[in-house]
């Protein structure tokens, strides 16, 4: 490939592992996936790759929050104003165009293919979503010669990981969390197991009913609230994660009654309000954020030091994404902790043991 008219801003210096990952992608012919944990600088590596090839670039994301983040980072890292194609805007005039999968999926197949022919390179952020039907239908119509996938968690529990590589190429670089922790690029959190003592009224319930009963249990919720209060008393900022919107709303209200600055960060919160919450949280004006899966990706809070996992997850890649929120280094940050709730049923303790193996692999204490 020719040298690109894009270049890194003078204050951006790639770390050795970032440079090595981009070089590996180039040597693989400009196709492949870079696997890197939260805090490793996936966006920096993606944009560094764009400086190696002189072509128009399409960045594909699956949320408006991520689209906005890429827009900001393009200006900071390569000094280019990216244009946005999605979320109500349809501007494809930029040297770099950031588009949402959902917007492209609404185009007719032939129309999308003709539109995408203007791009010589395609970057997919959170690339582990590519095997999903909606994203696959978009990817087959993107003819870009150069392709780069970025993800912390390429392995899918549904066994469709091969589809990711079919669309984007092999894994060309895999950056190890333990190595990053040794270099001080991420901070491995301490794991605190919090026994709730909770057990369901009857054994053998289906998963959805089990989670409903768990998240509406008064004693269990009191345990969560009390531990969050103690963390805030220690000067910590807490992210409480739950799979249920109602649970997040309940916990935010319960904590607000103790005069804490507690907010719910859920799907129904507007884009403008989310940006406002993140800005206030980064200024330490918010004590506790209670969030659903919308926080799994695209939640940018470098100063966050405490994550509470309040609903059990069988998807280890999702757990890894979630604890990654606390692993970014920050000068004013306390030792990060992940508070993992453990309940009484044997099945849930079995899932907790799988999480323990993940934590060990990631170098958590």
Task: State each model region's role.
Residues 68, 81-93, 109, 239, ...:
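Conserved helicase ATPase core of P-loop NTP-dependent helicases/translocases
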Residues 202-243, 249-254:
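Conserved interdomain hinge at the start of the Helicase C-terminal
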Residues 28-53, 290:
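Walker A/P-loop
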Residues 120-121, 128-192, 359:
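Post-DEXD/H (motif II) to motif III coupling segment of the RecA-like Helicase ATP-binding lobe
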């Amino acid at each position: 490939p020719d040298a690109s008219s894009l270049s890194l801003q003078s204050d951006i210096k790639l770390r050795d592992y970032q440079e090595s990952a981009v070089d590996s992608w180039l040597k693989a012919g400009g196709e492949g996936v870079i696997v890197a944990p939260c805090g490793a600088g996936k966006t920096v590596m993606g944009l560094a790759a764009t400086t190696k090839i002189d072509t128009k670039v399409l960045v594909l994301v699956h949320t408006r929050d991520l689209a906005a983040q890429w827009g900001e980072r393009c200006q900071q890292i390569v000094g280019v104003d990216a244009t946005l194609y999605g979320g109500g805007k349809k501007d494809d005039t930029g040297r770099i165009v950031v588009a949402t999968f959902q917007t492209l999926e609404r185009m007719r197949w032939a129309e999308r293919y003709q539109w995408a022919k203007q791009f010589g390179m395609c970057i997919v952020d959170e690339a582990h979503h590519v095997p999903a039907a909606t994203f696959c239908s978009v990817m087959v119509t993107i003819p870009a010669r150069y392709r780069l996938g970025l993800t912390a968690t390429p392995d899918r529990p549904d066994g469709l990981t091969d589809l990711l590589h079919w669309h984007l190429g092999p894994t060309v670089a895999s950056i190890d969390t333990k190595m990053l922790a040794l270099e001080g690029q991420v901070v491995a959190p301490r794991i605190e197991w919090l026994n709730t003592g909770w057990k369901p009224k009857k054994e053998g319930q289906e998963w959805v009913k089990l989670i409903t009963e768990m998240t509406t249990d008064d004693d269990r919720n009191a345990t969560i609230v009390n531990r969050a209060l103690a963390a805030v008393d220690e000067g910590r900022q807490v992210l409480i994660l739950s799979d249920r919107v109602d649970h997040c709303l309940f916990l935010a209200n319960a904590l607000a009654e103790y005069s804490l600055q507690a907010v719910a960060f859920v799907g129904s919160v507007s884009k403008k309000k989310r940006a406002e919450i993140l800005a206030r949280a980064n200024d330490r004006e918010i004590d506790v954020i209670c969030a659903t899966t919308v926080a799994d990706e695209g939640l940018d809070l470098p100063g966050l030091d405490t994550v509470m996992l309040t609903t059990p997850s069988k998807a280890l890649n999702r757990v890894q994404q979630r604890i990654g929120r606390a692993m970014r280094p920050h000068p004013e940050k306390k030792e990060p902790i992940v508070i993992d709730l453990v309940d009484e049923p044997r099945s849930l303790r079995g899932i907790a043991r799988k999480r323990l193996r993940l934590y060990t692999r990631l170098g958590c204490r």
